């Protein structure tokens, strides 16, 4: 399969630079997987689409203020984007500079350059950085870091983004990008879903900066997926198995929840799914056999991205590309701060190729 098979025309005017004033008031395009039928509505229509006993699986990662600005002690300006917190003193990061720093290079970070750090090692495209500061890494990031808005949101981050680019149920700090399907849930909607009898469970996948990297090969099968840390605890496994046993659906909120659950299913030895704690490089594209997910809530993704490939593997290639064409025609808002889709599984998708 060719990467260009997943391309589509997207006017810049449809890229959302700010979220809707009310989280749950975004538009919702529903795609019926087996038939390809499309319906238009608003996000709160989920109340009618979900049944008592259905299980929503959320990603409770919390976005950290992962973008730092500063300079090398020798003078050159740098931008640091944290990929992962290694411990209380060290991070793994992308560093943008006119000349890549060498091990031992001193870095002065923050608007006032008051935070001292040292680049200690290089791991491929990533740099290991150690802070020379008594505070834990997370405290330093909260003090001097900027919210790492995606590259297609072409504006500086604002104070409001610290709340808006965060799900209301975020709990475990570690992501450098929000699991954006979850941004549409507010407390009243969550309360209404619970009232209806919809079950909820929480995985953790710390979204890395690799999620924004373009696919740089021509053939999908040649792409090497970036690695991200995921946790699927026993209580999630129990909730999934219980939902399946009673004939209810497992509904993933976002592609990160999909990748977490499917990673846990791939690693399972005997059961459908088992607990999973570790790095995952799962790459889902047409031909993949889904094991756990029955429905998916997700935003609209970039052309030629691994995420539109994941959706195509779930709903079917033709149905997915037709839905995106319709979304563009109907002027849906795209990407992180944009509108959402509700998609049910297409069992024929596994045999469909572009």
UniProtKB/Swiss-Prot annotation:
Its main location: cytoplasm. NCBIfam families: PRK00147.1, queA. GO terms for molecular function: S-adenosylmethionine:tRNA ribosyltransferase-isomerase activity. Pfam families: Queuosine_synth. Belongs to the QueA family. Keywords: Cytoplasm, Queuosine biosynthesis, S-adenosyl-L-methionine, Transferase. It is found in: Cytoplasm. GO terms for cellular component: cytoplasm. Signal peptide: none annotated. This is S-adenosylmethionine:tRNA ribosyltransferase-isomerase. It catalyses: 7-aminomethyl-7-carbaguanosine(34) in tRNA + S-adenosyl-L-methionine = epoxyqueuosine(34) in tRNA + adenine + L-methionine + 2 H(+). Pathway: tRNA modification; tRNA-queuosine biosynthesis. Gene3D superfamilies: QueA-like. HAMAP family: QueA. The keyword Transferase applies. Transfers and isomerizes the ribose moiety from AdoMet to the 7-aminomethyl group of 7-deazaguanine (preQ1-tRNA) to give epoxyqueuosine (oQ-tRNA). InterPro entries: QueA, QueA_dom1, QueA_dom2, QueA_sf. GO terms for biological process: queuosine biosynthetic process; tRNA wobble guanine modification. Monomer. Its EC number is 2.4.99.17.
């Amino acid at each position: 399969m060719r990467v260009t098979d997943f391309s589509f025309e997207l006017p810049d005017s449809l890229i959302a630079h700010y979220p809707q004033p009310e989280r749950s008031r975004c538009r919702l395009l529903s795609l019926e997987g087996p038939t390809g039928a499309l319906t238009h509505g608003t996000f709160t229509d989920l109340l009618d689409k979900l049944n008592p006993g259905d299980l929503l699986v959320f990603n409770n990662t919390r976005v950290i203020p992962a973008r730092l600005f500063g300079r090398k002690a020798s003078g050159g300006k740098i931008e640091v984007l944290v990929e992962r917190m290694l411990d209380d003193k060290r991070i793994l990061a992308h560093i943008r500079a006119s000349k890549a720093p060498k091990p031992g290079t001193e870095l002065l970070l923050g608007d006032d350059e008051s935070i001292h750090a040292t680049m200690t090692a290089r791991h491929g495209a990533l740099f290991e950085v150690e802070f020379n500061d008594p505070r834990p890494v997370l405290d330093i990031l909260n003090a001097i870091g900027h919210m790492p808005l995606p590259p297609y949101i072409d504006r500086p981050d604002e104070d409001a983004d610290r709340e808006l680019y965060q799900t209301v149920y975020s709990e475990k700090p570690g992501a450098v990008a929000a699991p954006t399907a979850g941004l549409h849930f507010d407390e009243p909607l969550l309360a209404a879903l619970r009232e209806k009898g919809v079950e909820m469970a929480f995985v953790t996948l710390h979204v890395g900066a690799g999620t924004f990297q373009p696919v740089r090969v021509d053939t999908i099968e040649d792409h090497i997926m970036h690695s991200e840390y995921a946790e699927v605890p026993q209580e999630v496994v129990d909730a999934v198995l219980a939902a399946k046993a009673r004939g209810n659906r497992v509904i993933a909120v976002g592609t990160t929840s999909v990748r977490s659950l499917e990673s846990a299913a791939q690693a399972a030895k005997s059961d459908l799914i088992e607990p999973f704690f570790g790095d995952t490089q799962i790459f889902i594209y047409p031909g993949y056999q889904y094991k756990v997910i029955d429905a998916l809530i997700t935003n609209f993704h970039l052309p030629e991205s691994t995420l539109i490939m994941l959706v195509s593997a779930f709903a079917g290639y033709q149905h997915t590309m037709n839905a995106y064409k319709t979304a563009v025609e109907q002027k849906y808002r795209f990407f992180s701060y944009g509108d959402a889709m509700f998609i049910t599984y297409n069992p024929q998708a596994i045999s469909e190729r572009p």
